[in-house]
């Protein structure tokens, strides 16, 4: 009867004849057990003798003799032996279960619990019963149902199954319709609907249909007559109706004109036309004095003031011959000329502040100082959190949002928020279906220009990132950062199961598979192994049922 009870679990897997072997099987020859073990490991549909797998390390062998020779070495490495049948185990829970089967197997009563004396017909029922006794030793308790767990991760998985989802807080309420939202930007987008409705109603009242016939005669009234189109939100007036329509988009947030290159949106078409010159490189406004070209007309007007100022200062300066005739009047300031203006044409160009490194000129000295930091590498603005230095204050402000978590730039399509406007502009291209950046060599298209630049290095063979330690060059900066860890000895990827750390993430992934082969996530009831703990928890539900 005992032999029948102990022989039953062998159908569940190759590890069961060793794990739950009774006293009557101690005298059996090892080669017979190994031969049975090798046959049980054969997959269906294969001829006998083709595949034999070790129950401990899952290694496969072509014949049972090779398996038997390997098993002697494999068992010798297992640290925990059973004193009843000399069976060895890698983990203490497996040995404890194995010893309980030896102690509980009684021919007449079946399997008896050594703690409370309860008897069971099968060993699986005994193991499930023993888990109830061991539950009191688990340190983590569920606050809802008093169930205990070994790990915090098991408690979190249990709470997700048992506790109902907490409703999301929606503190932002619309004052017009009472609808609530979880985030402020969602409420702002929603309120545009009410603003558009109010604009339509106000436009229908203020801009009603004019009676047919001759146009109405101008009436005295000043701005109301000259600018008949008034905004219902802010009261601003316009001469033409298209200007009013374009102005309404300031209140509604509508931006119908989208750039096909980068996806940025604008309220007016002239803004889009001016923006597209950044991508095309067009500079239609030339300077008549020096020939320099500008992308926008305001930039040309600002630049032309430099030439006018130089021309006025040159005309106000005295003739060079007057230095020889009358030197004393030179000490008096000329009429109509500021005290700080230059005196000679040779000194006139001093108004332009030129960079001594690259020759670039600037109108103000502070602009020159900001520019010279690019050559000197000076970074006077330091972050108080991490100590990182920046050359411009705007860069420090943008970096500080990394520590504060502030993300003021929100996407209108999906609501995702970003800490910098450039990141939002790059994200908008993900919503655009087109891929404007096309490789001229192979025709592959990309959404972002940096991706195209990195791809083109494949065709050109360019490797601009050079290691300062060994001189090895790379095409991408991430590869250089990963390579430099060889020289610095940095190992940022640590294994959570042991004390080893690695310089590459791929090496950590390969290393963690060794823990899985050792049975890191192994079921204590049936011995089945899993790649991660979540799958093990899902598997244990079958035994609980």
UniProtKB/Swiss-Prot annotation:
Subcellular localization: Nucleus; Cytoplasm, Cytosol
Recorded phenotype for the gene knockout or disruption: Conditional knockdown in the whole animal, the liver, or in adipose tissue leads to a reduction in body weight and body fat mass despite normal food intake; animals exhibit an increased insulin sensitivity. Furthermore, conditional knockdown in the whole animal leads to reduced levels of inflammatory infiltrates in adipose tissue, conditional knockdown in adipose tissue leads to a reduction in adipocyte size and higher oxygen consumption, and conditional knockdown in the liver leads to higher oxygen consumption and activity, a reduction in liver triacylglycerol levels and adipocyte size.
Organism domain of life: Eukaryota
Modified residues (Phosphoserine): 27
Signal peptide: none
UniProt cross-references to SUPFAM superfamilies, sorted A to Z: beta-beta-alpha zinc fingers
Zinc finger (C2H2-type) stretch: 52-74, 80-102, 111-133, 140-162, 172-194, 229-251, 257-279, 285-307, 353-375, 381-403, 409-431, 437-459, 465-487, 493-515, 521-543
Gene3D superfamilies tied to this protein: Classic Zinc Finger (3.30.160.60)
Keywords of this entry: Acetylation, Cytoplasm, DNA-binding, Metal-binding, Nucleus, Phosphoprotein, Repeat, Zinc, Zinc-finger
Pfam families for the chain: zf-C2H2 (PF00096)
A Gene Ontology molecular function term of the record: sequence-specific DNA binding
Residues the record lists as N6-acetyllysine modifications: 39, 269
Sequence segments annotated as region (Disordered): 1-50
Gene Ontology BP annotations: positive regulation of D-glucose import; regulation of fatty acid transport; regulation of transcription by RNA polymerase II
Inducing or repressing factors: Increased in bone tissue of an iron-overload-induced and in an ovariectomy-induced mouse model of osteoporosis (at protein level).
SMART domains: ZnF_C2H2
InterPro entries from the UniProt entry: Znf_C2H2_sf, Znf_C2H2_type
GO cellular component annotations of the record: cytosol; cytosolic ribosome; lipid droplet; nuclear membrane
Quaternary structure and partners: Homodimers and homomultimers. Found in a complex with RIP60 and RIP100.
Function: Sequence-specific double-stranded DNA-binding protein. Binds ATT-rich and T-rich DNA sequences and facilitates DNA bending. May regulate the expression of genes involved in cellular fatty acid import, including SCARB1/CD36, and genes involved in lipid droplet formation. May regulate the expression of LCN2, and thereby influence iron metabolism and apoptosis-related pathways. May regulate the expression of genes involved in glucose transport.
Protein name as annotated: DNA-binding protein REPIN1
UniProt source species: Mus musculus
Lineage: Eukaryota, Metazoa, Chordata, Craniata, Vertebrata
Designated gene of the protein: Repin1
